[in-house]
Amino acid sequence: RNLFSKKICLLWLSSFKHHNISLTIRIVDELESQLLNNKFRNINKPTNILSFLIDENPIVGDLILCHPIIKKEARDQNIKIKDHYAHLLIHGYLHLTGLDHEKEKNAQIMENKEIAILKKLRIKNPYKSNIIK
């Protein structure tokens, strides 16, 4: 069954600051996520999302989402899977704009932007629960 409609996906994407953007969004299994994470980040385990910036102006990038991980996280956090997908798409997009969460200060900036965008979409703050980073 469809996880989200084209209409919902376009609504999420329209909340982004940059309108001149080209994204490829792929949904993969755990094996492919692990292979990509290992190849590009030297982390030999699957992850919920990977972001790959191809070009900065305009933003061109790939977002790779791992459905089994996202489904498990949504279940574990007792949130709607569609809301978790929206959060991760926004999270990945923010990485493409140059934000990261490696340092606490940067993490707070990124989280605040995520929360603000999600609020516009009427999605609750994911950091009030035990979100997996």
Question: Where would I find each of the regions flagged by the language model?
Answer:
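An acidic/histidine-cluster motif and surrounding catalytic segment
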Residues: 1-86, 96-133
